[in-house]
C-alpha cells in the first residue's frame, strides 16, 4: 500500500509497497477514504521525525477487518478515528495511508448524513479538547454542572477551539473566546457567548471586566507570548488555571503565582508513554485512555443527536501525493479557521 512516512532526510516522503499493519486485539483495520491535516502533523515531523513511520492523526474510512474482542464495529461500518503518526514505538500507527489501524475505543461511527471528508476532521479535536478541559494537566473541569461559569478559549476559531466551545456548552459552562472579528460569527455558531478581538491591546483586561474579575479557567489553543499574557490579564484577581496545547513561555508563566499553568500532549490519550525527547515526552497515563474511551462513546452519541458538529473544512484534491503541500501551508500559517481535508479514494 502507499503511505506518507518520515523521510530519512527530514519531512515526509511518499512510500510504495508499505505492508498493511497487523491487527492487535481491540483494533480495527480501515480502508481510508479521507484524511485531515493538523498543525501537529507539521510540528512532529519537523522536530521529532521518525524515518519510516507513518504520519497523520485524523482519518475516516470503512472497516475491512476487526481484531479480537472488538464489539462496537463490524466490517463495512463507516468510522472516523484518531491515531498518532511519527510514533517511534509503533511505526505502523498513522493516518496518511491507504489502510490505517485504529483502536475500537478511540473511534466513532459516522452518521449517515455525514461525508468521509467531514468526519475525518473530528478525531484529534475531540481528543485534544476533551483532555484540555476535563483532565490533568488540563483544566480538570466537571463534565456536568458548570452552572454557567465563564471559561476562556483563546483561539476560538481553531479546530480544537470550536470543539472546546461545544464541549463547554454541553457541560454547562459559558464559553468566552478570542478570535479575529471576521471569525466572530463562526465561533458564535458553535456556541460562543461573546467574542473578543485578540488584536486589541486591552483584550485581556476587557475580558476580566466582562467576566466580573471572576474568570478562573483558560484554554489557550494558539500559545505564544501574546496569548499567554492576554490570558493572564483576563484571569481574575483570585487566580486560576491556564492550559496550553504547546510548551508555554516560561518568561510569562511565573509572572502570576496565583495561576497554575501547564500544557498537554494529546497522544497521552493512548494511555502509553509518549516517547519524545525532553519536555515533549510523557509517561504512561492509563487514566487518559480510560477517559478517552468514555469521551469517544459520548462524542458518538453527541454527533448522532446533533450536539456537536465538525469544524469548517477545505477539500483539496491529489490524495497522499498532495498532503506535503498542505503541510507547508500549515507551516507558513496560511490556514485559518478551517481544516485541510484530502479524499483518498471513492
From Swiss-Prot:
Disulfide bridge partners, by residue number: none
Entry-linked InterPro entries: ADH-like_C, ADH-like_N, GroES-like_sf, NAD(P)-bd_dom_sf, PKS_ER, Trans-enoyl_RdTase-like
UniProt-listed Enzyme Commission number(s): 1.-.-.-
Extent of the signal sequence: none
UniProt-recorded Gene Ontology molecular function terms: nucleotide binding; oxidoreductase activity, acting on NAD(P)H
Domain of life: Eukaryota
Induction details: The fujikurins gene cluster is specifically expressed during rice infection.
Residue ranges the record marks as coiled coil: none
SUPFAM superfamilies from the UniProt entry: GroES-like, NAD(P)-binding Rossmann-fold domains
Protein residues bound to NADP(+): 40-43, 157-160, 180-183, 198, 245-246, 335-336
UniProt similarity note: Belongs to the zinc-containing alcohol dehydrogenase family.
Function of the molecule: Trans-enoyl reductase; part of the gene cluster that mediates the biosynthesis of fujikurins A-D, secondary metabolites playing a role during rice infection. The polyketide synthase PKS19 acts with the trans-enoyl reductase FFUJ_12240 and the polyketide transferase FFUJ_12241 to produce fujikurins, however, the biosynthesis pathway has not been identified yet.
Protein name according to UniProt: Trans-enoyl reductase FFUJ_12240
Record organism: Gibberella fujikuroi (strain CBS 195.34 / IMI 58289 / NRRL A-6831)
Origin organism lineage: Eukaryota, Fungi, Dikarya, Ascomycota, Pezizomycotina
Amino acid at each position: 500500500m502507499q503511505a506518507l512516512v518520515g523521510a530519512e532526510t527530514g519531512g515526509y516522503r511518499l512510500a510504495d509497497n508499505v505492508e498493511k499493519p497487523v491487527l492487535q486485539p481491540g483494533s480495527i483495520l480501515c480502508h481510508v477514504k479521507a484524511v485531515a491535516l493538523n498543525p501537529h502533523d507539521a510540528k512532529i515531523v519537523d522536530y521529532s521525525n521518525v524515518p519510516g513511520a507513518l504520519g497523520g492523526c485524523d482519518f475516516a474510512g470503512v472497516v475491512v477487518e476487526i481484531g479480537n474482542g472488538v464489539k462496537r464495529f463490524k466490517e463495512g461500518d463507516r468510522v472516523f478515528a484518531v491515531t498518532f503518526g511519527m510514533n517511534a514505538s509503533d511505526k505502523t500507527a498513522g493516518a496518511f495511508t491507504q489502510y490505517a489501524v485504529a483502536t475500537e475505543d478511540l473511534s466513532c461511527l459516522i452518521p449517515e448524513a455525514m461525508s468521509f471528508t467531514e468526519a475525518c476532521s473530528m478525531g484529534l479535536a475531540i481528543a485534544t479538547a476533551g483532555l484540555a478541559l476535563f483532565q490533568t494537566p488540563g483544566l480538570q473541569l466537571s463534565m456536568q454542572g458548570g452552572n454557567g461559569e465563564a471559561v476562556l478559549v483563546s483561539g476560538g476559531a481553531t479546530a480544537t477551539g470550536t470543539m472546546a466551545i461545544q464541549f463547554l456548552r454541553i457541560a454547562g459552562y459559558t464559553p468566552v473566546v478570542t478570535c479575529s472579528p471576521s471569525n466572530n460569527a463562526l465561533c458564535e455558531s458553535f456556541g460562543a457567548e461573546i467574542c473578543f478581538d485578540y488584536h486589541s491591546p486591552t483584550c485581556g483586561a476587557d475580558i476580566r471586566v466582562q467576566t466580573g474579575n471572576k474568570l478562573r479557567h483558560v484554554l489557550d489553543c494558539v500559545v505564544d507570548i501574546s496569548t499567554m499574557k492576554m490570558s493572564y490579564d483576563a484571569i481574575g484577581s483570585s487566580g486560576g488555571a491556564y492550559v496550553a496545547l504547546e510548551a508555554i513561555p516560561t518568561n510569562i508563566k511565573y509572572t502570576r503565582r496565583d495561576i497554575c499553568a501547564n500544557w498537554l500532549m494529546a497522544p497521552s490519550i493512548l494511555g502509553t508513554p509518549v516517547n519524545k525527547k525532553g519536555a515533549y515526552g510523557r509517561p504512561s497515563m492509563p487514566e487518559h485512555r480510560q477517559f478517552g474511551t468514555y469521551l469517544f462513546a459520548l462524542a458518538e452519541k453527541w454527533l448522532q443527536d446533533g450536539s456537536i458538529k465538525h469544524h469548517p473544512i477545505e477539500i483539496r484534491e491529489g490524495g497522499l501525493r498532495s498532503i506535503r503541500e498542505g503541510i507547508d501551508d500549515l507551516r507558513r500559517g496560511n490556514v485559518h479557521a478551517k481544516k485541510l481535508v484530502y479524499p483518498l479514494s471513492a
